[in-house]
From Swiss-Prot:
The lineage of its organism: Bacteria, Pseudomonadati, Pseudomonadota, Gammaproteobacteria, Pseudomonadales. The keyword Hydrolase applies. One of its GO terms (biological process) is tetrahydrofolate biosynthetic process. Belongs to the GTP cyclohydrolase IV family. It comes from Azotobacter vinelandii (strain DJ / ATCC BAA-1303). The record marks 156 as: May be catalytically important. Its EC number is 3.5.4.16. This is GTP cyclohydrolase FolE2.
Length: 298
């Protein structure tokens, strides 16, 4: 004879009665299939999933229901705004006996993108872009935010100007009494002395959060990444040979930027495609033991 298993979430009342904004699970490992043409392979994601518990008389939610819905989604559907809306709506329906009205899903993963070298044909490497998706179903509507981290290089304009001044002073000191100077002599001097001072530069990180527009059929993550990298002009490279490293040095010289410049460039680029967004940039200074930061939002 089968003996019924107890379910205290249904049969007992909470000793302390209060509504809860969110209840659920954090750190669930799942494979996710992105509905993006550039990503045919599954990505490993860490998921957070919750529903609200507005009724203070109900002791707890049914976490296994949320887990099974998420697990079925991960192995079945491609992730896009429409499929997320269906999943979250099902999570709310699964907790009708808890009087839940809202559901929330957060997915954290990294996009691996193949990036070609700047000049060398056939040379490329993998670059990782951390992504965080936050989807909420409330009042019959989906709100979906995407946060991306993008690495780039920044060279300080002030440091570049100070460097140029030192090189200029050294050049004048060497050739001021020489009268007419042959180009070959100038070239030889520059070969030896053009790096008697160098501007400081550093690896930098932009974190961009956007609200995916209602009616969007896809997330458009790679398009957003490329828009940001293009506006900055100095994306961090993967595999390089000397010609590529030289081209990267040229890009840094052509795109000198303070942290303020980077934040404004990104803001302008993101605002062309999204009405709700925030931008945060961090330059991990090589001159200082602290970072330079700037942020902006819509």
């Amino acid at each position: 004879m089968s003996i019924p298993l107890p379910d205290v979430a249904l049969t007992e009342l909470s000793a302390t009665r209060a509504p809860l904004d969110w209840v659920g699970m954090d750190g669930i490992d799942v494979p996710i299939l992105l509905d993006e043409p550039e990503f045919a392979y599954p990505v490993h994601a860490r998921a957070e999933v919750q529903v609200d518990l507005p009724d203070p008389a109900i002791k707890g939610i049914h976490m296994s229901r949320l887990y099974r819905l998420l697990d079925g989604f991960a192995g079945r559907d491609r992730l896009n705004p429409a499929s997320l809306a269906v999943l979250l709506r099902e999570m709310v329906f699964s907790h009708a006996d808890c009087n839940s009205t809202r559901a929330r899903l957060t997915l954290a993963f990294s996009l691996l993108c193949r990036r070609p070298a700047l000049l060398t044909q056939g040379l490329s490497g993998w670059k990782s872009y951390p992504v965080r998706l936050e989807a909420v179903w409330e009042a019959g509507r989906l709100s979906l935010d995407a946060t991306l981290q993008i690495g780039y290089s920044s060279t300080c304009p002030c440091s570049a100007a100070l460097t140029r001044q030192l090189i200029e002073q050294a050049f004048v000191e060497r050739f001021s009494a020489a009268g007419q100077v042959e180009p070959a002599a100038v070239a030889a001097w520059l070969q030896r002395n053009a790096t008697l001072a160098t501007p400081h530069s550093q690896r930098s990180v932009a974190e961009v959060r956007v609200r995916i527009p209602e009616g969007a059929t896809r997330l458009g993550l790679l398009a957003l990444i490329e828009r940001i990298e293009t506006c900055l002009g100095t994306p961090v490279q993967t595999a390089v040979k000397r010609a590529d490293e030289q081209a990267f040095a040229r890009l840094n010289g052509q795109n000198l930027m303070y942290v303020e410049d980077a934040a404004r460039k990104i803001r302008q680029a993101v605002a062309e495609g999204f009405s709700q967004f925030s931008v945060s940039v961090r330059h991990v200074e090589s001159l200082h033991p602290h970072d330079a930061v700037a942020s902006s939002s819509s």
